[in-house]
């Protein structure tokens, strides 16, 4: 198992190209199951979760080819089984996304209950209740979901809570259902919009994506023939490098991104004292060597402040001027990075779902351990500003969501390297 060694104290500067969004690529790859022939997906990030998804599709018998530009061609016509085994699903919660398309296209699915980051209870009951309402027969036994349906029927679904993967699974299922499906209280995330765009590019009829009411008119078949669909840029990777730049007092230009998807994050960075310039597909942030000002925020579903940026802003507040109050409303148990930051000298007090962060003038390098994807990133950011060396262990979490993080940070001037344990 690898770890990262980081020497702090260098301002980040330079230019960086942003990768495709993992959280858009995973549902789009699952949605290739809906196509009646080969479909090509581009701008896919090179990440462990993507490899896992490709292995999962390959185990079902799908034919996958990757070209020199890392475009992935998926041919679902060679499918041999409808089984998603525990050993693959347990490492990645998003594996549940094959359930809806398998059921809609092939009438059956056997999918292990999911794993992924250990942040709170992220139940799949909303997925199952929605599919049952569309006419699926569902049994959960021995840790597996067994689902069957002749042809799903369109219906009106009102989700009890906002769920991104739930919205995506039900949207994919509804794409081939008989009749119209309305999903109310749907997730509005850009990645949900990207999936809707992909389904429509194959001949689907999804409208309302980006609002909280989706309407899906089921069609008889979908085809990805001649389609090369590009995944949208990763807004969380973008945000992470912007915060890293703000923390180190640097100046960085991020290219191949989507500023329009980051309003809440950019507003908080400006509040922290960053000078931000935007283009259609680039963002430049300049701290002019200043120490950031502490900011207060609370997380909520898109378009509000993203929970996936909470840990990074906790790290920024740890070395900022003033006191920042961070309230986490999306997931419970999402402050596991706090204990590790305290080992580096951060002054953070936890009260229920709130972290009160009093900025200190310096952090000191220490051995720390990653506990989940975004927590790991925040510890890397803390290491970039700490005095001395920081060792971040269990970085397989980072590899699930950040493409070559040490190479990209080194490109911006950070002292960081990956070493085997």
From Swiss-Prot:
User: Cross-referenced Gene3D superfamilies, in alphabetical order?
Assistant: Enolpyruvate transferase domain (3.65.10.10)
The lineage's top-level taxon is Bacteria
The reactions it catalyses are: phosphoenolpyruvate + UDP-N-acetyl-alpha-D-glucosamine = UDP-N-acetyl-3-O-(1-carboxyvinyl)-alpha-D-glucosamine + phosphate
Where found?
A: Cytoplasm
Gene name on record? Answer: murA
Name-wise, this protein is UDP-N-acetylglucosamine 1-carboxyvinyltransferase
Q: Which InterPro entries match?
A: Enolpyruvate_Tfrase_dom, Enolpyruvate_Tfrase_sf, MurA_subfamily, RNA3'P_cycl/enolpyr_Trfase_a/b, UDP_GlcNAc_COvinyl_MurA
Enzyme Commission code: 2.5.1.7
> Which residues catalyse the reaction?
117
**Keyword Transferase annotated:** yes
Family, according to the entry, reads as follows: Belongs to the EPSP synthase family. MurA subfamily.
The residues listed in the UniProt record as binding phosphoenolpyruvate, with positions renumbered to this chain, are 22-23
Q: What job does this protein perform?
A: Cell wall formation. Adds enolpyruvyl to UDP-N-acetylglucosamine.
Its annotated pathway reads: Cell wall biogenesis; peptidoglycan biosynthesis
Instruction: Write down the CDD domains for this protein, in alphabetical order.
Output: UdpNAET
Molecular function terms from GO: UDP-N-acetylglucosamine 1-carboxyvinyltransferase activity
Q: Name the enzyme's class.
A: transferase
- Supply one GO CC term from the record: cytoplasm
Q: Which UniProt keywords apply?
A: Cell cycle, Cell division, Cell shape, Cell wall biogenesis/degradation, Cytoplasm, Peptidoglycan synthesis, Pyruvate, Transferase
Provide one Gene Ontology biological process annotation.
Answer: cell division
Q: Which residues carry this modification: 2-(S-cysteinyl)pyruvic acid O-phosphothioketal?
A: 117
Summarize where UDP-N-acetyl-alpha-D-glucosamine binds, as residue positions.
93, 308, 330
């Amino acid at each position: 198992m690898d770890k990262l060694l980081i020497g702090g104290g260098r301002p980040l500067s330079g230019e960086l190209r942003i990768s495709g969004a993992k959280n858009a690529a995973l549902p789009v790859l699952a949605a290739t199951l809906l196509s009646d022939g080969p479909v090509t997906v581009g701008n896919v990030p090179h990440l462990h979760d993507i490899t896992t998804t490709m292995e999962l599709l390959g185990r079902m018998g799908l034919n996958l080819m990757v070209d020199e530009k890392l475009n992935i061609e998926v041919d679902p016509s060679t499918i041999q089984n409808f089984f998603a085994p525990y050993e693959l699903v347990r490492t990645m919660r998003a594996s549940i996304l094959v359930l809806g398309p398998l059921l809609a296209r092939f009438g059956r699915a056997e999918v292990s209950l999911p794993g992924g980051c250990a942040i709170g209870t992220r139940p799949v009951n909303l997925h199952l209740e929605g599919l049952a309402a569309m006419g699926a027969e569902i049994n959960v036994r021995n840790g597996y979901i067994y689902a069957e349906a002749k042809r799903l029927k369109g219906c009106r679904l009102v989700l009890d809570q906002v769920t991104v993967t739930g919205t995506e699974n039900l949207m994919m299922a509804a794409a081939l259902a008989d009749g119209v499906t309305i999903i109310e209280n749907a997730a509005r995330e850009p990645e949900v919009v990207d999936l809707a765009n992909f389904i429509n590019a194959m001949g689907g009829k999804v409208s309302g994506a980006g609002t909280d009411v989706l309407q899906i008119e089921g069609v008889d078949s979908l085809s990805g023939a001649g389609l090369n669909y590009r995944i949208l840029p990763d807004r969380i990777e973008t945000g992470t490098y912007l915060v890293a730049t703000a923390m180190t007092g640097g100046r960085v230009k991020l290219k191949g991104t989507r500023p329009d998807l980051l309003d809440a994050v950019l507003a908080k960075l400006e509040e922290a004292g960053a000078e931000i310039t935007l283009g259609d597909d680039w963002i430049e942030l300049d701290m002019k060597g200043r120490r950031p000002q502490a900011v207060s925020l609370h997380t909520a579903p898109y378009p509000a402040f993203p929970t996936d940026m909470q840990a990074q802003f906790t790290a920024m507040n740890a070395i900022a001027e003033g006191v920042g109050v961070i309230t986490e409303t999306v997931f419970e148990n999402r402050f596991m990075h706090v204990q590790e930051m305290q080992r580096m000298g951060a002054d953070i007090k936890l009260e229920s779902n709130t972290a009160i962060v009093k900025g200190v003038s310096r952090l000191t390098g220490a051995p720390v351990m990653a506990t989940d994807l975004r927590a790991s990133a925040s510890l890397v950011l803390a290491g970039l500003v700490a005095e001395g060396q920081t060792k971040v262990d269990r970085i397989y979490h980072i590899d699930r969501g950040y493409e070559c993080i040490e190479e990209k940070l080194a490109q911006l001037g950070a002292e960081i390297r990956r070493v085997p344990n």
